[in-house]
Amino acid sequence: MSNQGKDSFKAYSYFCPCGQLFLTIHVSLTRLPQRQLDKRHVVDEKLNHIAHFSTGNKYYITRSDGGYEQRIQLLCRRCTLECAYALEAAPGYIYVDPTLVNEKPVTVSVSNLKE
């Protein structure tokens, strides 16, 4: 096991069921808050992360309270499964489905992070 210097740190990578890397972030999703509506983990895009997904279509869903929301699909680059979404009304957050992604601890180089 190598030492982690100032140029790298421990992070967590999340993979689509097809095996494609989807998201890398410095904290486990289990430590992040969950959205009450659908139990998705809420990732603030201000956190250091590396996004490995593509943006899909916008669509509307009807909520149980009678309201609606517009979502933006965040898709696996390989199989196009929607592993997460973003909300049009709340930019800056990613809502990740914990039932669709598999976690793997990794070491990340600081130079690869999105600021």
From Swiss-Prot:
GO terms for cellular component: endoplasmic reticulum. GO terms for biological process: endoplasmic reticulum to Golgi vesicle-mediated transport. The gene is new20. This is ER exit protein. It comes from the Eukaryota. InterPro entries: STEEP-like. Belongs to the STEEP1 family. May stimulate membrane curvature formation and subsequent endoplasmic reticulum exit site (ERES) establishment. It comes from Schizosaccharomyces pombe (strain 972 / ATCC 24843) (Fission yeast).
